[in-house]
UniProtKB/Swiss-Prot annotation:
Disordered: annotated span: 1-52, 128-211, 301-328
Comp. bias (Basic residues): 141-151
Keyword Coiled coil: yes
Keywords of the record: Coiled coil
Lineage, broadest ranks: Eukaryota, Metazoa, Chordata, Craniata, Vertebrata
Name listed for the protein in its UniProt record: Coiled-coil domain-containing protein 74A
Length: 378
């Protein structure tokens, strides 16, 4: 009991029970254990963040470079297609200018006058029955003089052609003619005339053909698919021609020489270091320009100063002599001032002698003036 009492007497007043003592010791141990670990955690967190940021930057740079490479490939592919289409457009215009009036006349003459005929595979056929012999002979005479006359539904009798077929054939013939003639292209000044003539001939043919096709297309189911295909091809060819002409106009307006483009292996994404180098170079050039401007200003000021100096020196000495006493009278004493009136009036008496003349008087006056000036300066 006495030992327990002594132990109880030694306890601090703030811990009446042993349970509270244990609770206070536990957090102290935890705090002591956490104190040495806190700087390690602080050091590890920024390192992890730096690694994650570097990985994300590398991934973004790779994506950026891949996207740039793909875009440049697409641009080159589109440029090649545009050049091909532009070449085809020019050759079609030249071929239409040469063979335009004769082809239009033949196509109009070969078409029958009645609205009951339908064109199947390039041959005009009546939907209810076989075609007459006149159409056979007319088609063979006009378009195929050396061929057979008994064919109706075959692909050999090409009496009327669709616009897409005519474009393809004319482009093929034009390529042959240019390869034989040494790739001689027409001048750009003649493109406008060719465009106007070709547009007029194409509009006349396209306006006549749909009227004849649409009259009996609903009755013949086999012809609808071919007509739709021909329309789609014609529309695609027209759109391509229009796009090429617009692109040609833009190129001619912008300039004859295209902009210089680096090849793909030399194109690399810009980095922060490159940007910093560029900024430093621009800053240095700016400083050099400012220094040059200051130097030029100083030269201009120096060239203007000697011009003002001779102007000041060109003033007469009489004015300096007259202005000098006025300025000096402020700082001089009374003794240095001009002499009184009595001294001025005192002059030697004139004697009636032959030596007295005007020259002597003038010399005396000059001597008096010199003395006065000497006194005023002192």
């Amino acid at each position: 009991m006495s030992g327990a009492g002594v132990a109880a007497g030694t306890r601090p007043p703030s811990s009446p029970t042993p349970g509270s003592r244990r609770r206070r010791q536990r957090p102290s141990v935890g705090v002591q254990s956490l104190r040495p670990q806190s700087p390690q955690l602080r050091q590890s967190d920024p390192q992890k963040r730096n690694l994650d940021l570097e990985k994300s930057l590398q991934f973004l740079q790779q994506q950026h470079s891949e996207m740039l490479a793909k875009l440049h490939e697409e641009i080159e592919h589109l440029k090649r297609e545009n050049k091909d289409l532009h070449y085809k457009l020019i050759m079609n215009q030249t071929s239409q200018k040469k063979d335009g009036p004769s082809g239009n006349h033949l196509s109009r003459a070969s078409a029958p006058l009645g609205a009951r005929w339908v064109c199947i595979n390039g041959v005009w056929v009546e939907p209810g029955g076989p075609s007459p012999a006149r159409l056979k002979e007319g088609s063979s005479r006009t378009h195929r003089p050396g061929g057979k006359r008994g064919r109706l539904a075959g692909g050999s009798a090409d009496t009327v052609r669709s616009p897409a077929d005519s474009l393809s054939m004319s482009s093929f013939q034009s390529v042959k003619s240019i390869s034989n003639s040494g790739k001689a292209r027409p001048q750009p000044g003649s493109f406008n005339k060719q465009d106007s003539k070709a547009d007029v001939s194409q509009k006349a043919d396209l306006e006549e053909e749909p009227l004849l096709h649409n009259s009996k297309l609903d009755k013949v189911p086999g012809v609808q698919g071919q007509a739709r295909k021909e329309k789609a091809e014609a529309s695609n060819a027209g759109a391509a021609c229009m796009g090429n002409s617009q692109h040609q106009g833009r190129q001619m307006g912008a300039g004859a020489h295209p902009p210089m483009i680096l090849p793909l292996p030399l194109r690399k994404p810009t980095t922060l270091r490159q940007c910093e180098v560029l900024i430093r170079e621009l800053w240095n050039t700016n400083l050099l320009q400012t220094q040059e401007l200051r130097h030029l200003k100083s030269l201009l000021e120096g060239s203007q100063r000697p011009q003002a100096a001779p102007e000041e020196a060109s003033f007469p000495r009489d004015q300096e002599a007259t202005h000098f006493p006025k300025v000096s009278t402020k700082s001089l004493s009374k003794k240095c001032l001009s002499p009184p009136v009595a001294e001025r009036a005192i002059l030697p008496a004139l004697k009636q002698t032959p030596k007295n003349n005007f020259a002597e008087r003038q010399k005396r006056l000059q001597a008096m003036q010199k003395r006065r000036l000497h006194r005023s300066v002192l």
